[in-house]
Amino acid sequence: MATLFIADLHLCVEEPAITAGFLRFLAGEARKADALYILGDLFEAWIGDDEPNPLHRQMAAAIKAVSDSGVPCYFIHGNRDFLLGKRFARESGMTLLPEEKVLELYGRRVLIMHGDTLCTDDAGYQAFRAKVHKPWLQMLFLALPLFVRKRIAARMRANSKEANSSKSLAIMDVNQNAVVSAMEKHQVQWLIHGHTHRPAVHELIANQQPAFRVVLGAWHTEGSMVKVTADDVELIHFPF
């Protein structure tokens, strides 16, 4: 058996091929797993569990079917869907996890996260992240009418796109010191995350031992998952 990890699908109505590919994944590979972990940015945007978006209901039902089949499903928030709440989690049968979680998998201690907190060189983003994760600000935003939330979210996405266009690729990648610090804090030799859209398996030293950082790819033109078994940790790409 295997435990599966995915991230950065950025589901939206404008990308039906990705949605169709994810539905096939849920109906196939996911049903064979010991567990499924979604490490953030499942959706391109999330302005509240109360948004009457048919895509959200469709995805909730599909994930719930996996959960009901006996495969536990877990979710860590990303930078796009950090407002996804308990209502959607309940509807989809997912368990919400903290932003950093250590798993014991087949004899390995594995740290999982979305990955945006590792990009500490991007001071502008980290300041923005700290602001929008304030509970009182989230409560205020979610209390606004839906049409107002949609306008604010659209403006924020436009501002983010403009800001990122002038940033170097290095700044938007993880900081190696932040990676080592996180792994040593949790005493792990394995880290799995998404966010950067730069799929790879990196070797490093943490806790004075060889360690590995596995980065999930985004679901742009193909699917991406990490498959952890008793024998191996594989980064796998597959067609929709």
From Swiss-Prot:
<comment type="function">
    <text>Hydrolyzes the pyrophosphate bond of UDP-2,3-diacylglucosamine to yield 2,3-diacylglucosamine 1-phosphate (lipid X) and UMP by catalyzing the attack of water at the alpha-P atom. Involved in the biosynthesis of lipid A, a phosphorylated glycolipid that anchors the lipopolysaccharide to the outer membrane of the cell.</text>
</comment>
<feature type="binding site">
    <location>
        <position position="10"/>
    </location>
    <ligand>
        <name>Mn(2+) 1</name>
    </ligand>
</feature>
<keyword id="KW-0997">Cell inner membrane</keyword>
<keyword id="KW-0441">Lipid A biosynthesis</keyword>
<dbReference type="Pfam" id="PF00149">
    <property type="entry name" value="Metallophos"/>
</dbReference>
<keyword id="KW-0443">Lipid metabolism</keyword>
<protein>
    <recommendedName>
        <fullName>UDP-2,3-diacylglucosamine hydrolase</fullName>
        <ecNumber>3.6.1.54</ecNumber>
    </recommendedName>
</protein>
<feature type="binding site">
    <location>
        <position position="167"/>
    </location>
    <ligand>
        <name>substrate</name>
    </ligand>
</feature>
<dbReference type="GO" id="GO:0019897">
    <property type="term" value="C:extrinsic component of plasma membrane"/>
</dbReference>
<feature type="binding site">
    <location>
        <position position="79"/>
    </location>
    <ligand>
        <name>Mn(2+) 2</name>
    </ligand>
</feature>
<dbReference type="GO" id="GO:0030145">
    <property type="term" value="F:manganese ion binding"/>
</dbReference>
<keyword id="KW-1003">Cell membrane</keyword>
<keyword id="KW-0378">Hydrolase</keyword>
<keyword id="KW-0464">Manganese</keyword>
<feature type="binding site">
    <location>
        <position position="114"/>
    </location>
    <ligand>
        <name>Mn(2+) 2</name>
    </ligand>
</feature>
<dbReference type="GO" id="GO:0009245">
    <property type="term" value="P:lipid A biosynthetic process"/>
</dbReference>
<keyword id="KW-0472">Membrane</keyword>
<feature type="binding site">
    <location>
        <position position="8"/>
    </location>
    <ligand>
        <name>Mn(2+) 1</name>
    </ligand>
</feature>
<feature type="binding site">
    <location>
        <position position="41"/>
    </location>
    <ligand>
        <name>Mn(2+) 2</name>
    </ligand>
</feature>
<comment type="pathway">
    <text>Glycolipid biosynthesis; lipid IV(A) biosynthesis; lipid IV(A) from (3R)-3-hydroxytetradecanoyl-[acyl-carrier-protein] and UDP-N-acetyl-alpha-D-glucosamine: step 4/6.</text>
</comment>
<dbReference type="InterPro" id="IPR004843">
    <property type="entry name" value="Calcineurin-like_PHP_ApaH"/>
</dbReference>
<dbReference type="GO" id="GO:0008758">
    <property type="term" value="F:UDP-2,3-diacylglucosamine hydrolase activity"/>
</dbReference>
<keyword id="KW-0444">Lipid biosynthesis</keyword>
<feature type="binding site">
    <location>
        <position position="195"/>
    </location>
    <ligand>
        <name>Mn(2+) 2</name>
    </ligand>
</feature>
<feature type="binding site">
    <location>
        <position position="122"/>
    </location>
    <ligand>
        <name>substrate</name>
    </ligand>
</feature>
<keyword id="KW-0479">Metal-binding</keyword>
<feature type="binding site">
    <location>
        <position position="197"/>
    </location>
    <ligand>
        <name>Mn(2+) 1</name>
    </ligand>
</feature>
<comment type="similarity">
    <text>Belongs to the LpxH family.</text>
</comment>
<feature type="binding site">
    <location>
        <position position="41"/>
    </location>
    <ligand>
        <name>Mn(2+) 1</name>
    </ligand>
</feature>
<dbReference type="InterPro" id="IPR029052">
    <property type="entry name" value="Metallo-depent_PP-like"/>
</dbReference>
<dbReference type="InterPro" id="IPR043461">
    <property type="entry name" value="LpxH-like"/>
</dbReference>
<feature type="binding site">
    <location>
        <position position="164"/>
    </location>
    <ligand>
        <name>substrate</name>
    </ligand>
</feature>
<feature type="binding site">
    <location>
        <position position="160"/>
    </location>
    <ligand>
        <name>substrate</name>
    </ligand>
</feature>
<feature type="binding site">
    <location>
        <begin position="79"/>
        <end position="80"/>
    </location>
    <ligand>
        <name>substrate</name>
    </ligand>
</feature>
<dbReference type="InterPro" id="IPR010138">
    <property type="entry name" value="UDP-diacylglucosamine_Hdrlase"/>
</dbReference>
<dbReference type="GO" id="GO:0005737">
    <property type="term" value="C:cytoplasm"/>
</dbReference>
<feature type="binding site">
    <location>
        <position position="195"/>
    </location>
    <ligand>
        <name>substrate</name>
    </ligand>
</feature>
